[in-house]
Amino acid sequence: PDIGRGLQGTTPGLSVVIPSGEIGSDPTIKVRGQIGSIDGSSTPLILLDNVEIPSIQMVNPDDVESITVLKDAASASIYGAKAAFGVVLITSKKGAKSEKVEVSYSGNFSWQNISKKMEMARVDGIQYRIDALKRAKGTLYGAFWYVDETSLERAKEWDKTWGGKLGVNDPFVYGRDWYVDASNRKFSIRTFDPYDYMIREWAPSQTHNISLSGRSGKTVFNVGLGYLDQNGLMKLAKHDDFRRWNGSIRLSTEINKYITARAGANYSKRNKRYAYATNSTTADPWLYLYRWDSTYPIGYDENGNEMRSPASEIHQANTANKENNYLSFNVGATLQITKDWKFDIDYTYAGEDQIWKKNGTKFTAADTWTSPVKRLDGNGNQIYVNNMGEVVSAGTEGAMPAYGLSYRQYTADGANPDHIRREVTNAKRHTLNITTDYNWQIN
């Protein structure tokens, strides 16, 4: 979807790495693997028609005529300290070579899926932990939800009876899927795969690029437009997508044999929407996706309430919106003083705005992190259930006191409902480049 990914593997010494699967993320570009600081935050200078741009995503792929990578010390001598870690020179198309107007279009529709699914251990994972517990001379393991040898045996029985038969919308039933011991500790014997709850099997994307170029006498022009629409893999988010609009115009005319004038403009808008739950439970939901073992419940309790989990928080989270706008104008001229001596002057104005809206969220869920509560009937009497979760009388064989999860509202760091945050960053730059070239050949 962008030039950076297209550069992968094309040039020796050029490393282009996609840092994450996050939609809309910029590729990390390194020339000869150079690192300029402890955190490795050094990147080459990116120039579009000799105009610095902050991101390679701002360039419409169909507008590119050529790309040159400067890797040696010569790049710094020409472009200064900013080019200490190399230069990526992008030259755009200038216009048609013949007296006509040319229109080109390219587009594609594609589907993305996760590159590798991390398989969660089920009952065998519980067995592994119990074996480790025995070697450590322990008898109980867990936090919020526990496992011991008794729960392991019950989990094995659950897997024989219910394994592969319950879906993501089937409730978490007391007696069948979990129980409470005499010390008021919760034990889950049902196993969950968080992948099924949080990640889409596939996500669509589309790109469209159109280019218009032409020539009239000694004047050439090129107009390019591009659009990218990419959906993320987060299943439960209200919005998880990235959109990019690019536009450019180039105009050049030869006034006489000594002077050539040029002008151009670039526009880029990038918009990313995502569930504002990045720090909703002291860490990223993607960490909690695999932090807990497979016995930690996800989905709904038997009252139809969402249970507290990274999936529930992503589902309920308000949508954050991150927007980047970039606009530049440039004018310039080339003076051909003699056949071997030319003089270039270019002026560029560039402005970039970043607007980041983050609306806090108040979460409501059955709390899987706190102590269970007794289930009582309308008269305040204890309810009893069997190992299928069915309500039975207290004297029935196998009857056990029924428990449930408390239903409450809560907030956490990073998604607090008491704020509606709007961050605006503006960067304006005026650049004047004056260069001269003289070719002198000695025989």
Q: Language model features by range: what are they?
A:
Residues 1-247, 260-262:
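Short, small/polar-rich motifs associated with maturation and membrane association
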Residues 3, 326-328:
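Short, solvent-exposed loop/turn segments enriched in Ser/Thr/Gly
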Residues 105, 223, 331, 434-436:
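Residue-level preference for non-acidic, small/hydrophobic
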Residues 106-110, 226-228, 266-268, 330, ...:
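Outer-membrane beta-barrel pore domains and translocons
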Residues 107, 129, 206-208, 341, ...:
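Polar/charged side chains located within well-ordered beta-strands of beta-rich proteins
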Residues 114-116, 186-226, 230-233, 244-324, ...:
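Flexible loop and strand-edge segments within Gram-negative outer membrane beta-barrel domains
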Residues 121, 130-194, 290-313, 372-425:
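Flexible glycine-rich, low-complexity coil/linker segments exposed to the extracellular/periplasmic environment
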Residues 251-255, 324, 334-349:
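A conserved hydrophobic secondary-structure block that centers on an alpha-helix together
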